Amino acid sequence: MDVAEASTMRKGKSRNFATYDKVNQSSPTPRYKVVRYGAGYFYAFANDWQFRTALSGQWSGDTLIQGEQMRLGGADGVRGFSEGSETGEVGARMNVEGYLPTYEAGDAKLRALVFWDGGKVTAKSGSSIAISSAGFGLRSAYTNQYSFRMDAGRIMKAGNDPQQLKGDWRIHASLSATF
């Protein structure tokens, strides 16, 4: 479990600070405060089956620049949505995952999973949006040097983006190498 607070250094003027949000022209608060929190739970069953859940969120009474707002969509958020597809000053998201046993062949490991992700954000204006998805994924590693992650998420509850509709699928994938 974790809790963190972030704030500005009491510098800047709102007329200058608004230059960070030329898209939405939201007039962000120059002296903002944000409280962020998170908690997680992991349980390993017999025969290498695993369960994991995580909750994260934030609260702010101020209008925030885009970089400080809570973002829901993406590979590390609500999978099945594009990165940061829904944003707000206040929000929470939850991830629930079930992992199948690891398959090993020599130095290679492969594990499959199923997941449900959901979240809700509220903007300073008072508008709120909730989104959710469900899907499956793979985690693979070769020695300790290479890893692969792939998640395919199906939108269960769509947000405001007319190009991300209920029933749509999106794949998030990454390949990493450590030297």
For each feature predicted by the language model, list its residue ranges.
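C-terminal transmembrane beta-barrel domains of outer membrane proteins
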Residues: 21-179
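Hard-cation-handling environments
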Residues: 1-18
